[in-house]
């Protein structure tokens, strides 16, 4: 049985997750940039004209970086943290490996409660299992708000600072809170390995309306609660482009097209694929790229 249905986003979206400082080394070329779901999805929602809030945690020394997001019209709800989440992404072709040398403190329920009455969609984008405290998922399960969840961070583990596949304890509570879920094809295998069954069975068990599965240049597919399966094709992307954040952009563009613009699944998927391809071609890079000069970033306290 579907827990929530018939949604239209009219008041806005709150994106919940880490704001990160990423060192992306793409095909041998490195750059430092502002990242995380709050950056990529937040800017994508603003490009669709939706009022957008972010709920995040960041070290005080790095808080001025959020001005890049507020300049785009994003409203900031940021709590302090001893550290800022940082990733090192090594990208060669379609292959990516990650390290996470630093992570912020978890996002708490009281932060999320502050935006609940201002929006009609919560976009959850945890980047690691402890990014958002599990109580947030329990809180959102009982709310009338549309909940969109990217599971990427809940199917990751850390081993000696390296990011590897592995499901955590927060996976099931996040699924129980979500109406729309996104994984890539590899992440889906991790979910199914941890919980068993298939996509249709999990959607029924957790009352999920739509499940988006991305597969980079192979396109992907979108499953619906009524048993539908909607394949979509990937849009051609610029060779050698940086794919970091493309999944965040895809999910935000899909959510906006589907629930704000009222497009059907197929058209929303096609629009999201086009937005992701534009992102890989660096459509957002001019706003988010940071200077590589070391003294432009203050050390964390």
Language-model region placement:
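Short catalytic helix/loop segments, enriched in acidic residues and glycine
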Residues: 31-43
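Short, conserved phosphate/pyrophosphate- and ester-handling motifs at nucleotide-, phospho-/glycolipid
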Residues: 45, 184, 247
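Conserved beta-alpha-beta core of the PfkB/ribokinase-like small-molecule kinase fold
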Residues: 121, 125-201, 218-219
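A short, N-terminal amphipathic alpha-helix
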Residues: 40-51, 204
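Conserved phosphate-binding/catalytic region of the ribokinase-like
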Residues: 2-10, 164, 168, 172, ...
């Amino acid at each position: 049985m579907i827990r929530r249905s018939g949604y239209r986003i009219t008041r806005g979206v709150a994106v919940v997750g880490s704001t990160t400082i990423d060192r992306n080394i793409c095909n041998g070329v490195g750059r430092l940039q502002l990242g995380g779901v709050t950056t990529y999805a937040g800017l994508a929602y603003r490009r669709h004209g939706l009022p957008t809030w972010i709920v995040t945690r960041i070290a005080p020394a790095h808080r001025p970086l959020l001005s890049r997001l507020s300049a785009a019209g994003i409203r900031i709800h940021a709590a302090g943290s001893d550290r800022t989440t940082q990733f090192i992404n090594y990208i060669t072709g379609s292959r990516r490996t990650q390290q996470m040398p630093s992570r912020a403190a978890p996002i708490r329920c009281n932060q999320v409660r502050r935006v609940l009455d201002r929006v009609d969609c919560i976009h959850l984008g945890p980047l690691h299992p402890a990014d958002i405290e599990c109580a947030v998922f329990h809180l959102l399960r009982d709310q009338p708000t549309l909940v969109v969840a990217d599971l990427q961070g809940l199917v990751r583990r850390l081993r000696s600072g390296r990011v590897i596949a592995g499901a955590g304890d927060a996976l099931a509570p996040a699924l129980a809170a979500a109406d729309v879920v996104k994984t890539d094809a590899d992440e889906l295998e991790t979910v199914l390995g941890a919980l068993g069954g298939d996509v249709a069975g999990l959607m029924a068990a957790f009352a999920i309306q739509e499940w988006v599965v991305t597969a980079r240049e192979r396109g992907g597919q979108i499953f619906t609660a009524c048993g539908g399966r909607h394949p979509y094709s990937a849009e051609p992307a610029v060779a050698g482009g940086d794919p970091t954040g493309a999944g965040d952009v895809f999910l935000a563009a899909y959510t906006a097209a589907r629930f704000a613009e009222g497009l059907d699944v197929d058209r929303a998927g096609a629009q999201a694929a086009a937005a992701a391809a534009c992102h890989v071609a660096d459509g957002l890079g001019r706003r988010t790229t940071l200077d590589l000069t070391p003294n432009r970033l203050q050390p964390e306290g």
